Structures are given as structure tokens and as C-alpha cells.
Amino acid sequence: MEKYINVIGGGLAGAEAAYQIAKRNIKVKLYEMKPTKFSPAHSNENLAEIVCSNSFKSNLHTNACGVLKEELRILDSLLIRIADETAVPAGQALAVDREKFSKRVTEELEKNSFIEIINKEIDEELLQKMIDNNETVIIATGPLTSDKLAKKISKITGNEKLYFYDAAAPIVSKESIDFNIAFYGNRYEQEKKKDESIEEWKKRIENQEKSYINLPMNKDEYEKFYNELVNAEVVELHNFEKREIFEGCMPIEIMAKRGKDTLRYGPLKPVGFDDPRYAKRP
């Protein structure tokens, strides 16, 4: 009887699992319900689709995120290798072109002779059949698990599913940004040094890697922005969503409602920047 491992879910975890198993000359059946069926969060047909932020966080070896990525490079992680190949400027972080990234992962897995990609939704009956046949199964469907499969997992584990309300990452067109006000700069690298003249500082920041675009605000502008944000129309919940917030991935409008200064001491803190128009912190 031919030996193989079933991997259910062709997202980030499932794609990496399939690659690592195949690398060890073990056959894989990789099940992905797209393009037959899409979850409300999915939009393209490729494997390893990035549905939230395109940032894999820091590349620096001075923090845990960077060290973990370097270890994954040493261990020949498919995802990190392709992330490096499809990287876009992001300062000291590793961010990717989400379309190129998922397309390249799909190409790598499709050409692997040890991997069979099956575009089919796994439901309760199919999973039970795998279990009855004593097949090895890796379930890597993550937070976008279909309802049919989620019910079966709940029965097997005896636990209700976990849940949190995720925030979508907005995409802003560069053409819509006024660069008479906005400026490029990485936090702490863009800031004027005490021993620099204005001319030396401006020359240095002009030659910096253009990774992040910053939009400075004065007090009146910030207060107007804050009021617009907390009173803005919000996306209506889908019938499968509940507004249960995870602190590590919080929608900005919910964070703002905790207080007017919350953003100023959080993601919008001006520390590490100087506005090139005035050579001082916004």
C-alpha cells in the first residue's frame, strides 16, 4: 500500500508542511478547497494566500522575530525563501508582494513530484474516512476553517473553536499621497542627530532607503483625524463574525475608542521622526 500524508489546508502552514514532507521523499496529498470554494476572506486561487498584513515582521537578529526567520532559512523553509525572493522595501522588516509570493509558492508545490494538490473541501465524512483508514492527517486550515470541517474537529477534540475578530490591512494608492507633506523614513533612522546640521540631516535622509511613508500631523490635524476615525462608518459584521477582539491584532478604530491619546502612544507615536518641513518632531 502506498504511503502518503494528507495535509488539509493550502495556506501558509499547509504549504510549508507539504514542502517539508515532500523534501523527505514522502508523498503528500495537499487538500485545498479553492478555487472550488472561497472563504469570505480569500480572493485569489493560489496557495499560501496572504489575507492580512504582508509583513513578516523584523529581520533583525537582535529580536526574536529576526532570529526565528534566520533559523527557518537555515532549515530551508519554503515560505521564508520565497518571501526573500518576493520582498518589497520595508526597512528592517521582511514584507512581501502578496500576489507574487502566493504565486511562487503555488508554482513550487505544483512542480514537486511528491505533492498532489487536490482542490476539494474536506467535510466531516471525508475526514472520518481518513481516520478510519488510519491515514496520517495534518489539519492546517487555521482561522479560515470551513464550517463543515470545524464541526468535525470540535467533535474529535471535544472543544469549541477559538475565535477573534481580525483587522484588515488597508491598501493606499501612492498617487493619492501629498509628498509636500508626507515623507519617507524609518523610525529612529530618520530623526535628526544632535551633532548634524540641517543640511547634513536633509542630505542623509534623502539617501535613506525609501521603505515607509509617514504623514505628520499637528495637534489640530490629529484631533480632527481622531474624531473622524472614532465616528466613521465601520464594516458590517458577516453572519459568521463576532466582535471579540484579540489585543495583538486590534482594529485601529477600536483602539482609538480607548482614549484620545491611545494612538499617540501606540502605532501613531511620533518618536524617532522629525518633520523635514520644520526639522522637529511632529
Predicted features along the sequence, with ranges:
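Residues at the starts of beta-strands that form the adenosine-phosphate
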Residues: Y4, K27, K161
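N-terminal FAD cofactor-binding segment of flavoenzymes
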Residues: Y19-R81
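Short beta-strand to alpha-helix junction loop
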Residues: L60-A64, V88-R104, T141-K148, I213-D220
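A short alpha-helix-loop-beta-strand transition element characteristic
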Residues: H61-C65, K69, S77-Q92, G158-D166, ...
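Predominantly flavin-linked oxidoreductase catalytic cores and closely associated redox partners
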Residues: N112-P282
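Beta1/beta-strand and adjacent pyrophosphate-binding region of the FAD-binding site
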Residues: E2-A13
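Helical element adjacent to the flavin cofactor pocket in flavoenzyme catalytic cores
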Residues: R98-I117
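Cofactor-binding loop segments of dinucleotide-utilizing enzymes, especially the Rossmann-like FAD-
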Residues: G10, M33, A167
